[in-house]
Amino acid sequence: MKVSEFQFDLPEALIARYPTKERTASRLMHLATTGLSHLQFTDVVNLINPGDLLIFNNTRVIPARLLGQKASGGKVEVLIERIIDEHHVLAHVRASKSPKEGTQLLLEGKVEMEMVGRQDALFTLKLLNPEPILEILEQYGHMPLPPYIDRPDEESDKERYQTVYNEKPGAVAAPTAGLHFDDVILKQLRDKGVNTEFVTLHVGAGTFQPVRVDNILEHQMHSEYAEVPQNVVDAIAKTKTAGKRVIAVGTTSVRSLESAAKAALENGTALASFFSDTDIFIYPGYKFQVIDAMLTNFHLSESTLIMLVSAFAGKENVMNAYQEAIAQQYRFFSYGDAMFIEKNQD
């Protein structure tokens, strides 16, 4: 299967560079097995039934971008990919020349780091300040907006590039389907009898990496840390037994749940809790084990995420839906509109 089969041309004007004024003010495309319809996000309450289980990703985006210079004076930009411990991180480092081991960095005029190792494209940096890294980032870091938003981060992004139910710090990109939910709509869903649970997947910067091969089977997926606790496994079993639906909010929730299912299949067991790195790559032909419907935003052309959605709802259905979204001027990507998709697999 070729990457080019997932290509579409998007007018620049349809890239959402700012969120809507209210979280729930986005539009919602409903891609059902019978066709598609155009709704408002608030209509999602009518699409989810009592007894259905909504599963969210409760990761918290850390202000992971730091700007500054090397001791030599050269400009440098650090994007933290993963926190190792309170004083060590794995990071992407952009500079005119890659820093050598022992190179010291002064970031945001206050943060001192030293390059102590390298893992492929990532650098291991040691924080020299006495405070723990999370405290430093909350004080000095910039929100790591995706490259296509193409503007400096603003104070408002600290709230809006974050779900209202975020809990566990560690992501460097938001689980964007969740950005549409506010406390009011969550209460409406719970009052209706919809059940909710939370998984964790710390979204890495790799989520924005383009697929650089022609044949998708040759693509090496980036790795991210995911958690599916036992209470989520139990809630899924209860939902399935009752004949209700498991609905994932976002591709990161999908990947967490399907990673747990894949591990269970490999171990020859029933679905079990999962606390591990995952590099699961879902593309057409994949048979979903857990989810019956999903909420997601509109994704980049030729990305692994549009491949995942195509695996869930059928490639032709998804690519046609994207053309319709462009014709109807939906807003795309992280701060854009959403889709509610029902599983459509042979």
From Swiss-Prot:
Monomer. PANTHER family: S-ADENOSYLMETHIONINE:TRNA RIBOSYLTRANSFERASE-ISOMERASE. It is found in: Cytoplasm. It holds the Pfam family Queuosine_synth. Its EC number is 2.4.99.17. The keyword Cytoplasm applies. Belongs to the QueA family. Gene3D superfamilies: QueA-like. This is S-adenosylmethionine:tRNA ribosyltransferase-isomerase. It comes from Pseudoalteromonas atlantica (strain T6c / ATCC BAA-1087). It catalyses: 7-aminomethyl-7-carbaguanosine(34) in tRNA + S-adenosyl-L-methionine = epoxyqueuosine(34) in tRNA + adenine + L-methionine + 2 H(+). Keywords: Cytoplasm, Queuosine biosynthesis, S-adenosyl-L-methionine, Transferase. The lineage of its organism: Bacteria, Pseudomonadati, Pseudomonadota, Gammaproteobacteria, Alteromonadales.
